[in-house]
Amino acid sequence: MNRKILYIYPWKAAFIDKDLDFLSRRYSVVTLGHDWRDKRRTLPNFLKQFIFLCRNMAGTRAILVMFGGYWSFLPALAGKFTGVPVYIIPGGTDCVSFPSLNYGSLRKPVMRTFIRWSYQLCTKLLPVDESLVLSDYTYLPDADHPKQGFRYFFPGLLTPHRVIHNGFDPAFFTADPAGKKENSFIAVAHAQEMQRVRIKGIDLVILLAKRFTHCTFPLVGVSDSLNRELSPLPSNLSVYPWMSKEKFIGHLAESRFVLQLSVSEGFPNALCEAMLCHCIPVGSAVGAIPSIIADTGFVIASPEWEYLEKRFEEILHTGAEEQHRLGIMARNRVADMYHISRREKAFLEILDEIPG
């Protein structure tokens, strides 16, 4: 059996490391570590990727590509010519378009074309949630599109798909439920510029902190430069930059609730990690968030302030016993439904099915 796999990604992230970890236990995984976020590097990256593929296609069992984009086109094309199976993993922004918010890869005509070509050429799509395939969008009242998902934007796409959710390790993300601070709401948003403030719901977190002054709101993942732009902030809102997972768990261990008020999400990792630490989820009705939360927390149907304020008051009136129960349920749901072993099993099934 051929044991070599190519794994392509546009930038390195912790959730990619998890994939590489379990794949490397069974296969020899070869990666190409280019960062495609700098537009000035697009053409040089294409050249480097072409050379990489020429050198590594021989003897390759399969190619995995995280997200659709410029970086997924050449691997998909190479797979089509050589017969090597190519699996693209749509993760969020590569399935949505919000022109009014300057968000979503599919709002850009050229990027959208490369994504469409990639999705057409590849063997199978492995989205992290069904909402990225096709879903109604009702969260924003003035949304650009009534639906989101790659089958909405590419209605003629014939490539099959299989949903494989992100996976998490309950043994690593764990905390004592007795160590929670009352009325504490942690929010996590990897944000370096003002555009992300609206996308990730940071604007709503700030409003909530101003209104509910007896609550505390740790906000993790905001760059120092953006923090300065947002200042002054309410005294009960503490801003932290991106941090190690160990420090992050320390903050999760103290927080009673976790806020995920994004206007668009794929399958939010931080939400699940917080739930494993017994944080009660409070999340917007977008992407995978409602199905992740289910009956373990609170789904926010709209960002409209009157509704949000009333909903938040209801959340604060939840009794201590009920809060404890919800925290336990939140951890159990992620541990049962989204265990890393499930993702590993699904990927290995697909790779083991390949002839040869």
Question: Regions from the language model: what does each represent?
Answer:
Residues 96-98, 286-299:
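Short acidic/histidine- and often glycine-rich active-site loop of Leloir-type glycosyltransferases
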Residues 298-306, 314-320:
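Conserved acidic donor-binding segment of nucleotide-sugar-dependent glycosyltransferases
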Residues 165, 169, 177-212:
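Conserved donor-binding/catalytic core segment of Leloir-type glycosyltransferases
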Residues 227-249:
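Nucleotide-activated donor-binding/catalytic signature segment of Leloir-type glycosyltransferases, i.e.
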Residues 320-352:
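A charged, aromatic-enriched C-terminal amphipathic alpha-helix characteristic of glycosyltransferases
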Residues 116-161, 168-169:
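A short, active-site helix/loop in glycosyltransferases that binds the activated sugar's phosphate group
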Residues 279-283:
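Short hydrophobic beta-strand element within catalytic cores of glycosyltransferases
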Residues 263:
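Aromatic "clamp/platform" in nucleotide-sugar-dependent glycosyltransferases that forms part
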